[in-house]
Amino acid sequence: VLAYDVRKFLDKRGVYNPGLPNPVLGLTSRDFCQYACGVYAANGIHAHILPAEASRFVPTPELSYTIRELRAHGGLNMTASHNPPDDNGSKFYTELGAQPVAPEDQLMSELVDRVSTIRHLSWADAVRSGRVHFLDDACHRGYIEMCRKESLIPPPKLDEIRVVFTPLHGVGYFCAGEVLEAQGFHPIPVPEQMTPDGSFPNVTKTPNPEVPECLDLAEGVAREKHAHLVIATDPDADRYGGLANTKTDGTGDYRYLNGNELAALLTHFKL
């Protein structure tokens, strides 16, 4: 299984010599995924990927679900996660939908270092080989429904809980946003940050929801709408951050919640 986020390799930090030819510049995560499909197909491995014309993306949590749903041997997500676009790379997931841990991760790294030649097919030849399979909406619908069923509370009454949501120009709407809607919430969008855009034009500092400054726009919307919560996801949607209003009617101040605090609150609620 292969997925991709919205990044394009632009060398924003200027670390490459502009006088040298560089075929990487300008490539998107989708291009890298198609190249990976060519490597897999050339080596007799079947790969599943969204069609190039798809209007949605596969967030990292959904990738983990899709691996198990398709009984795949693993998954690969081309993403820079919450880092600058120049850090576009890959996240590998095992057949369990989890990232490898020690010592497996080190063994994989050593295997990569020993590779001296690469068998590769062009994208067109990889598709013609029959080893590239295009994902339909079935897995996506299954993922949203699975998440919805995990909810411990009934759907809220209209306006009972007002939630502002931002994917920070990433792909989080396709998981967190849709799950909120499926469960009966009416998430209030941050209009400037809803469109997937790997240059993050409307994000302060960094697209990392664990950095409070990147929630400035969302907090502004929350104050205007007297929202109870702000929920933000990082570009590939496997990292969350948020704000909570200090008053139940949404008229208080907003308190930033880091990952440890969110985990503690959710664990306490579930127990």
Regions found by a protein language model. Give the residues of each.
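Gly/Ser/Thr-enriched, mixed-charge loops and adjacent short helices
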Residues: D86-L217, V221-A222
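Short, hydrophobic alpha-helix immediately C-terminal to the catalytic nucleophile
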Residues: S64, G177, A264-H268
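N-terminal small/polar loop signature for handling phosphorylated ligands or for N-terminal nucleophile
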Residues: A3-D87, V179-G242
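Active-site catalytic microenvironments for nucleophilic, acid-base chemistry
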Residues: E69, R114, A182, F269-K270
